[in-house]
């Protein structure tokens, strides 16, 4: 067991990608990197952690991650020679629309019918009012950036009075720029006031896994979830 975060820090959400690349390198080179700065365990259960690099023959490794909003994940990395052969059985899945939610110009419509509208002067105020209209009380909602609030609120209406088993539902989210508007705001603060001014209140609840994670927690969804960044929305391509 080891941690790589101490080598390069948080990196605003890119650490999981960097760590995965390093894990692949470790597998290929049969070396387990030490946990930088490790001195003693901080947990009661015994775990094998070392500060020094070790040469260990490896076939597989498990990369785990814990993201903001309670979104946790794990992937298994395997050397090509030890990979299981994929099943050739393919199942046909019919995709059809059961409900739609549209949010535009301070108006929220469901299946083409307006269910909430507001005279709010800006989107930030409108989306808060739209969420309050659902009767929701998740205080984490107010920490999210506006794009996360948009996705979270839309699902509140979309899944209202829907019954399903946790494993029956997955999530596929798409937008054109991830959390770019908040990322720009975060960078402007650093440019104007320096690195010390960077604040979690600006960037913590912005990443795509936040909106996906909070939706899963709220609705007890245990299926797979994915966030795709595409310039143009193509429903047919996503279904494929």
Regions found by a protein language model. Name each.
Residues 1-240:
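Conserved "HGTGT" condensation-loop signature of ketosynthase/thiolase-family condensing enzymes
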């Amino acid at each position: 067991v080891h941690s790589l975060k101490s080598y390069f820090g948080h990196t605003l959400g890119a650490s999981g990608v960097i760590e995965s690349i390093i894990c692949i390198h470790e597998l290929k080179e049969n070396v387990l990197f030490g946990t930088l700065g490790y001195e003693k365990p901080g947990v009661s259960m015994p775990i094998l952690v070392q500060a020094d690099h070790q040469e260990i023959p490896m076939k597989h490794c498990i990369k785990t991650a814990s993201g903001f909003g309670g979104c946790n994940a794990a992937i298994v990395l395997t050397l090509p020679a030890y990979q299981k052969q994929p099943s050739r059985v393919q199942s046909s899945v019919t995709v059809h629309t059961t409900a739609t939610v549209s949010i535009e110009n301070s108006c929220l419509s469901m299946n083409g019918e307006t269910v909430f509208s507001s005279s709010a002067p800006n989107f930030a105020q409108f989306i808060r009012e739209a969420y309050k209209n659902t009767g929701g009380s998740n205080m984490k909602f107010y920490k999210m950036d506006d794009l996360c609030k948009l996705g979270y609120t839309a699902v509140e209406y979309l899944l209202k009075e829907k019954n399903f088993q946790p494993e029956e539902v997955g999530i596929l989210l798409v937008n054109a720029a991830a959390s770019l508007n908040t990322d720009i705001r975060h960078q402007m603060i650093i440019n104007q006031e320096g690195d010390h001014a960077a604040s979690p209140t600006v960037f913590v609840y912005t990443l795509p896994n936040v909106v996906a994670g909070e939706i899963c927690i709220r609705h007890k969804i245990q299926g797979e979830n994915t966030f795709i960044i595409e310039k143009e929305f193509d429903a047919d391509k996503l279904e494929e």
